[in-house]
Amino acid sequence: MAANMYRVGDYVYFENSSSNPYLVRRIEELNKTANGNVEAKVVCLFRRRDISSSLNSLADSNAREFEEESKQPGVSEQQRHQLKHRELFLSRQFESLPATHIRGKCSVTLLNETDILNQYLDKEDCFFYSLVFDPVQKTLLADQGEIRVGCKFQAEIPDRLAEGESDNRNQQKMEMKVWDPDNPLTDRQIDQFLVVARAVGTFARALDCSSSIRQPSLHMSAAAASRDITLFHAMDTLQRNGYDLAKAMSTLVPQGGPVLCRDEMEEWSASEAMLFEEALEKYGKDFNDIRQDFLPWKSLASIVQFYYMWKTTDRYIQQKRLKAAEADSKLKQVYIPTYTKPNPNQIISVGSKPGMNGAGFQKGLTCESCHTTQSAQWYAWGPPNMQCRLCASCWIYWKKYGGLKTPTQLEGAARGTTEPHSRGHLSRPEAQSLSPYTTSANRAKLLAKNRQTFLLQTTKLTRLARRMCRDLLQPRRAARRPYAPINANAIKAECSIRLPKAAKTPLKIHPLVRLPLATIVKDLVAQAPLKPKTPRGTKTPINRNQLTQNRGLGGIMVKRSYETMAGAGVPFSANGRPLASGIRSSSQPAAKRQKLNPADAPNPVVFVATKDTRALRKALTHLEMRRAARRPNLPLKVKPTLMTVRPPVPLPASSHPASTNEPIVLED
């Protein structure tokens, strides 16, 4: 029962999602709501997976410095990987969560130089922290102060003087006497002078306009004049005047008016005092943060002095009593039963044996963390299309520590080529940036799974806006910049305004001429006619004339097909369909063919420039070239006079056989 009893100050696990790791929080308050439920006000602690990569690099450098200074024993890569899961970052962010979402207790300690990091791996539910994370400023700062050692920060203690040895140092330069206990005045005379000093201070506050506003009553003015700063000034006046009461009295009341001594309690306004109380409630006695966030116009010494004076006021005593009474009325502890509901990520296979559910889930897959194939329980992990899973022990580790036991290949470690890659805990840009480290077979599998078919279906109003608001939409310019945002609301509003005023004439529709099926079949057959088989032993002659043939203008600006760019053509049969894999066409040479992987298809298209295209580029004007670039799928119409036809270069007689339509093959 003690394990399910949670008190204020405990570090606990909170579950906000069935598939995400637990949240580590510290209970600050337990409050009962109006409907009877219990809510916990908690302090947020963050994992490494919750902060940016730049802050992770900063944490790594801090960890290396700690290991060097504390002389930590060496650890393996797997242990270092698991130690990152045990590191947390404290914050000053509070939130309220239902107490029913608590899933267990854990331990979080401040890392110090005497700790050995390996000990954290031997303990269950044990974490450490050394840095504080600010979710608003996105910064990491040290949680504990630094002790500065050296002659710049500490006083140099001189050697002890021997008996009878005199100190030759000038004491007047080293110290100043502020009070002489052997003065000629009696204690009664000193007390009477202090009473006169308080009366002078009260009279001075009555004459001061700002003080009369802050202390409107005589009682408050007398209380302010009785504080230490008035008494210290009176005793210092006696010391400076040689304990002559007449001279000291005339110093307290000069010709211009009585001397007014104020401390920090009087210098601060009521609004500044309220700000200080609010900051003290949020940050505690962290005066640097109080000054930085709430009172930047005050000095640190002024804030510290005001704090200790504020603790002597009646307001502080009343607040302290109210907080004590409120704390007594609040809950000190709460009992949360053990959570026994099944997890939605649990894999249940139909027809599996008892105790081995998930056995029929993609047989052959292993645990993404420990790579085991046997487990009493399996859990789905990562994106659904990845079909990744974790065993029972690795799932508990994932929920508690926010990572896998072993580093995956996407995290920089080397794994086997047959192991699946887990990307569920990475964002999409990180997974894409790490894809070169994967093998080609698994990368093709990932790409094939991620390619989803989608359909863009436009509404009637959108199709009307393309024509009516062409000046605002600029469809050609938008097509060249597909990632630039378009203000759809403004275009929709403008289209609604122009629609009633638009002409009612029907649009001219250009009918699409569709060729009959017989014509299409003839064209497909003509593209790849069957060739007679070449008998074995005969070498395919090389057509030297093909190397010097000029390319016609019709195929210069035509976009090349993927087969041409890939370096190997796809064979076609007589009916125009591509041949099945493994069947060699007669039109292809006997050289070794490379099977293309659809997942490795290149995204960019490469255009090879020849002498003809360069001459064509010079013949075109700038406007014609831009128009052709906007419509690369249309043939380019060029006047024959613009192109200079080169005379054919005579070739020497070749002893090779006649030219053939077979492609050129160069054997290695």
UniProtKB/Swiss-Prot annotation:
Cross-link (Glycyl lysine isopeptide (Lys-Gly) (interchain with G-Cter in SUMO2)) at residue(s): 492, 508, 559, 595
Domain ELM2: residue ranges: 145-256
Role according to the record: May function as a transcriptional coregulator. Acts as a component of the histone deacetylase NuRD complex which participates in the remodeling of chromatin.
Protein name per the record: Metastasis-associated protein MTA2
InterPro entries hit by this protein: BAH_dom, BAH_sf, ELM2_dom, Homeodomain-like_sf, MIER/MTA, MTA1_R1, SANT/Myb, SANT_dom
Coiled coil spans: none
Primary location group: nucleus
Positions of modified residues (N6-acetyllysine): 152, 460, 522, 531
Residue span, BAH domain: 1-144
Family: Belongs to the metastasis-associated protein family.
High-level lineage: Eukaryota, Metazoa, Chordata, Craniata, Vertebrata
UniProt crosslink position (Glycyl lysine isopeptide (Lys-Gly) (interchain with G-Cter in SUMO2 and SUMO3)): 492
Modified residues (Phosphothreonine): 534
Pfam families found in the cross-reference section: BAH, ELM2, GATA, MTA_R1, Myb_DNA-binding
Organism listed in the record: Mus musculus (Mouse)
Residues carrying Phosphoserine: 52, 54, 433, 435
Keyword Cytoplasm tagged: no
Zinc finger (GATA-type): 367-394
Keywords associated with the record: Acetylation, DNA-binding, Isopeptide bond, Metal-binding, Nucleus, Phosphoprotein, Ubl conjugation, Zinc, Zinc-finger
Residues annotated as domain SANT: 263-315
Subunit annotation: Component of the nucleosome remodeling and deacetylase (NuRD) repressor complex, composed of core proteins MTA1, MTA2, MTA3, RBBP4, RBBP7, HDAC1, HDAC2, MBD2, MBD3, and peripherally associated proteins CDK2AP1, CDK2AP2, GATAD2A, GATAD2B, CHD3, CHD4 and CHD5. The exact stoichiometry of the NuRD complex is unknown, and some subunits such as MBD2 and MBD3, GATAD2A and GATAD2B, and CHD3, CHD4 and CHD5 define mutually exclusive NuRD complexes. Interacts with CHD3. Interacts with CHD4. Interacts with GATAD2A. Interacts with HDAC7. Interacts with MBD3. Interacts with p53/TP53. Interacts with MINT.
Region Disordered, residue ranges: 412-437, 580-599, 647-668
Cellular component aspect of the GO annotation: chromosome, telomeric region; histone deacetylase complex; nucleoplasm; nucleus; NuRD complex
GO molecular function: chromatin binding; histone deacetylase activity; histone deacetylase binding; RNA polymerase II-specific DNA-binding transcription factor binding; sequence-specific DNA binding; transcription coregulator activity; zinc ion binding
